[in-house]
């Protein structure tokens, strides 16, 4: 996964972005070729990561931050 500089805006490390997507607890596909991943950082803080799905299936992370409560409902048991 490639990480766009905009995904670092909130100070989330690249390794945590990758960890959250690789260990996602919820993945929501959007109508505009983006995906929302909700998953843990390496320290178990829940993150929200948005990626753009490219032709060929590769993804570009464009947003990452601590998960907002509005996404709690998407998690198992949420």
Regions found by a protein language model. Name each.
Residues 1-78:
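Ribonuclease/tRNase effector modules and their secretory precursors
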């Amino acid at each position: 996964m490639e990480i766009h500089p905009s995904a670092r805006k909130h100070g989330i490390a690249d390794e945590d972005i990758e960890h959250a997507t690789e260990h996602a607890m919820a993945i929501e596909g959007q109508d505009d070729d983006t995906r929302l991943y909700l998953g843990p950082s390496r320290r178990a803080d829940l993150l929200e990561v948005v990626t753009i799905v490219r032709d060929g299936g590769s993804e570009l992370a464009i947003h990452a931050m601590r998960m907002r409560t509005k996404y709690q409902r998407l998690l198992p048991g949420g």
